Amino acid sequence: MKVCSFLPAATNMIYEMGLERYLNGVTFECPSDKPKVVRTRLEGRNLSSAEIETFVTESSNMGKSLYYVDMELLSEIAPDLVFTQDVCDVCQISTSVVQRAIGSLEKQPKMVPLIPRRLRDVYQNALTIAKELGEEKIGLDYLASLHKRVRAITDKLREHQAEPKRVMVMEWLDPIYNCGHWIPDQISLAGGVDMLSNPAGYSVVTPWEKVQQYDPEVLVIAPCGFQVERSIKEIDQLTSKPGWSELTAVKNKAVYLADADYFTTPSTTLVDGIELLAALFHPQLFEIPETCMKKVVPISDTELSWV
């Protein structure tokens, strides 16, 4: 069976389950040496957060997709199965674009759209992938290992009767976006509550005044698609805002930059994200996982690096 994964989350889970032998094509974002079938019009553009927001908005208004398929490569692969998504046309290539692309192929592959809204949907997607590849047992074992890691966190929070922290996870810097979809589930399991979030829904522009009024105890900044190194370059867009130093999170030195993959890629990295958040929300109970050490930075550390 020849498989193409048109979203990094599916690619990640396929690799995590040890099923990469089925993969024949992936996206430009996938950490894989497989042929890159899906590309984006943003490749090679060194744009700021505000410029990306403008580009995305203008493309949407003109009915243009941010992504396209390398049809020559896809025809050469002639996949039997294609995993795609139907959650966010900004984050990944949409099902409608994929449908048009595969419609011109001589051999029509089976298309399996993955539609995660909450964390439980992400788990179900892993099982769907395993079943489609004829490897259900591997999928079940994989899920059991993820659930075990999450239970270790929730059990410890319950044991110590830890009070939920008032937090905010920010998905974009300019303009500021709150978090949505499965991220509020991650926050809850890690011992926090984000009253600015939009569970199971899209993240939306959130006025700075609203953030000030909410006054989070812990602030985690993880712009979609950005790694810490990229976010550091634009963090002054927040730190220069009026009233920044008055936020409780700032006073408590509880503001962090983190890689977006821990929150915006609906795969096993979400469990890594839960473990990371638990350590940021309740440092007296949890330590930052060793695998996350280089992918999360306290704002105070970034400020020192500018001196």
Task: Tell where the protein language model's regions lie, with residue ranges.
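N-terminal ligand-binding lobe of clamshell/alpha-beta domains
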Residues: 1-307
